[in-house]
Protein backbone atom coordinates (compact mmCIF):
# COMPACT_ATOMS: atom_id res chain seq x y z
CA UNK A 1 0.00 0.00 0.00
CA UNK A 2 1.37 3.43 -0.87
CA UNK A 3 1.85 6.23 1.62
CA UNK A 4 -0.20 9.37 1.68
CA UNK A 5 1.04 12.77 2.79
CA UNK A 6 -1.23 15.45 4.21
CA UNK A 7 -0.95 18.70 6.11
CA UNK A 8 -3.64 19.57 8.62
CA UNK A 9 -4.27 22.94 10.22
CA UNK A 10 -5.97 22.56 13.58
CA UNK A 11 -7.83 25.53 15.08
CA UNK A 12 -9.35 25.96 18.52
CA UNK A 13 -7.80 25.57 21.96
CA UNK A 14 -4.78 23.63 20.73
CA UNK A 15 -1.76 25.45 22.17
CA UNK A 16 -0.66 25.19 25.79
CA UNK A 17 -2.66 21.99 26.35
CA UNK A 18 -0.15 19.29 25.29
CA UNK A 19 -1.67 18.96 21.83
CA UNK A 20 1.60 18.46 19.93
CA UNK A 21 2.92 15.90 22.41
CA UNK A 22 -0.32 13.94 22.47
CA UNK A 23 -0.49 14.03 18.67
CA UNK A 24 3.08 12.73 18.52
CA UNK A 25 2.22 9.85 20.87
CA UNK A 26 -0.94 9.00 18.88
CA UNK A 27 0.97 9.13 15.58
CA UNK A 28 3.71 6.87 16.91
CA UNK A 29 1.14 4.31 18.05
CA UNK A 30 -0.36 4.34 14.54
CA UNK A 31 2.98 4.18 12.73
CA UNK A 32 2.49 7.64 11.20
CA UNK A 33 5.50 9.89 10.57
CA UNK A 34 5.71 13.67 10.14
CA UNK A 35 5.56 16.50 12.65
CA UNK A 36 3.41 18.86 14.72
CA UNK A 37 4.23 22.56 15.07
CA UNK A 38 2.62 25.56 16.77
CA UNK A 39 1.76 28.41 14.40
CA UNK A 40 1.80 32.12 15.16
CA UNK A 41 -1.98 32.39 14.68
CA UNK A 42 -2.69 29.97 17.58
CA UNK A 43 -3.29 26.93 15.39
CA UNK A 44 -1.21 23.76 15.13
CA UNK A 45 0.16 22.45 11.84
CA UNK A 46 0.29 18.65 11.60
CA UNK A 47 2.04 16.95 8.70
CA UNK A 48 1.30 13.24 8.56
CA UNK A 49 2.55 10.50 6.29
CA UNK A 50 1.85 6.81 6.31
CA UNK A 51 -0.66 4.30 5.10
CA UNK A 52 -4.03 5.90 4.37
CA UNK A 53 -5.91 4.10 7.15
CA UNK A 54 -3.41 5.11 9.83
CA UNK A 55 -3.34 8.75 8.69
CA UNK A 56 -7.14 8.85 8.62
CA UNK A 57 -7.27 7.40 12.16
CA UNK A 58 -4.94 10.17 13.32
CA UNK A 59 -7.11 12.81 11.64
CA UNK A 60 -10.23 11.31 13.23
CA UNK A 61 -8.57 11.45 16.66
CA UNK A 62 -7.82 15.14 16.03
CA UNK A 63 -11.37 15.81 14.75
CA UNK A 64 -12.77 14.32 17.95
CA UNK A 65 -10.84 16.87 20.00
CA UNK A 66 -7.39 15.41 20.51
CA UNK A 67 -6.10 15.31 24.09
CA UNK A 68 -8.00 16.23 27.22
CA UNK A 69 -7.97 20.00 27.68
CA UNK A 70 -7.94 20.71 23.95
CA UNK A 71 -10.89 21.86 21.88
CA UNK A 72 -10.81 21.48 18.10
CA UNK A 73 -13.08 23.98 16.36
CA UNK A 74 -11.86 23.46 12.81
CA UNK A 75 -9.60 21.05 10.94
CA UNK A 76 -8.45 21.86 7.41
CA UNK A 77 -6.48 19.27 5.45
CA UNK A 78 -4.76 19.30 2.08
CA UNK A 79 -2.21 17.18 0.23
CA UNK A 80 1.45 17.60 1.17
CA UNK A 81 4.42 16.96 -1.13
CA UNK A 82 5.96 13.51 -0.60
CA UNK A 83 8.69 13.99 1.99
CA UNK A 84 10.77 11.30 3.72
CA UNK A 85 10.14 11.41 7.47
CA UNK A 86 11.85 8.91 9.77
CA UNK A 87 9.73 9.63 12.85
CA UNK A 88 6.94 11.88 14.07
CA UNK A 89 8.58 14.92 15.67
CA UNK A 90 7.65 18.16 17.34
CA UNK A 91 8.96 21.23 15.57
CA UNK A 92 9.53 24.63 17.11
Swiss-Prot record:
The keyword ATP-binding does not apply. Its EC number is 3.6.1.7. Gene3D superfamilies: 3.30.70.100. It comes from the Bacteria. InterPro entries: Acylphosphatase (IPR020456), Acylphosphatase-like_dom (IPR001792), Acylphosphatase-like_dom_sf (IPR036046), Acylphosphatase_bac (IPR028627), Acylphosphatase_CS (IPR017968). The active site is at residues 20, 38. SUPFAM superfamilies: Acylphosphatase/BLUF domain-like. GO terms for molecular function: acylphosphatase activity. Keywords: Hydrolase. It catalyses: an acyl phosphate + H2O = a carboxylate + phosphate + H(+). Residues 5-92 form the Acylphosphatase-like domain. It is an enzyme of class 3 (hydrolase). Belongs to the acylphosphatase family. This is Acylphosphatase. It comes from Yersinia pseudotuberculosis serotype O:1b (strain IP 31758). The gene is acyP.
